[in-house]
A protein has these predicted regions:
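Extended, solvent-exposed segments with strong compositional bias
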Residues: 158-184
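A glycine-anchored, Pro-Gly-centered beta-turn/N-cap motif
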Residues: 185, 192-204
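Primarily secretory-pathway and cell-envelope proteins
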Residues: 4-168, 205-223
């Protein structure tokens, strides 16, 4: 399979996002923290959620989740992501960002500090986790941001892994990829060449099992 030709060592640190530059070498990607903000297009059904999120002080807050205590808090159907309560169940890991549904997650600056040199054969990402027993399609999302001079944004949406690669999720900026375990505690994710269009990208890690914040690895693909 595709993982067998790769001989690169596992990254040194947990939650390191790396891009393979050959079968045996990689570069570490920069990590950035996003801010939750109101979606910049028309709201429609998300207006109520946005209002509730604003009232709870989510808007403009860092995306993060408390590991103190395992209380699950739901206010107006939103999961609490602030310091008051964390979502304690591993099974709920993918719901960390549920409170951000329909909101934009924005990153300062119009461009990542890292540009992929050659994306013509697709992009291979190597990510070290706590362990690699989860399906990477459930715990990672790769997005193509809407980029302006001032920031990069993605409207957050929740969907099952089976929808990765569907027309609807791709239209919203969610990139199709495949994932496999690699080594003792890493994952190898592959973005096919057909998806590796010029633009600004981010890799979201959605599990909250040990995370107190959600680091997002970013990269650019030039024309």
């Amino acid at each position: 399979g595709f993982a067998q030709q790769v001989t690169a060592p596992e990254p040194e640190f947990i939650n390191s996002y790396c891009v393979l530059t050959s079968d045996s070498t990689f570069d570490a990607l920069p990590k950035e923290d996003g801010m939750i903000s109101k979606h910049q297009n028309k709201f429609g059904k998300f207006a109520k959620i946005a209002g509730a999120v604003g009232d709870l002080g989510f808007a403009g807050g860092m995306i993060g989740v408390s590991t103190a205590g395992s209380a699950s808090g739901a206010i107006n159907g939103l999961r609490v992501m602030g310091t008051a309560a964390g979502v304690g169940q591993a099974a709920d890991a993918v719901n960390t960002l549920a409170g951000a549904e329909g909101m934009d997650i924005a990153f300062a600056g119009g461009k990542s500090a890292y540009t992929v040199k050659n994306a013509s054969n697709g992009i291979r990402l190597l990510i070290k986790g706590e362990k690699n027993e989860y399906d990477p399609m459930e715990i990672y999302r790769i997005v193509r941001f809407k980029a302006s001079k001032k920031d990069r944004r993605i409207q957050w949406m929740e969907f099952k892994p089976a929808l990765i690669g569907s027309a609807e999720t791709k239209k919203r900026g969610y990139v199709a990829f495949t994932g496999h375990k690699y080594g003792n505690q890493s994952y190898l994710l592959e973005i096919p060449a057909s998806e590796a269009e010029p633009g600004e990208y981010g890799i979201f890690y959605m599990s909250i099992i040990t995370a107190t914040a959600i680091p997002v690895g970013t990269f650019s693909i030039n024309k």
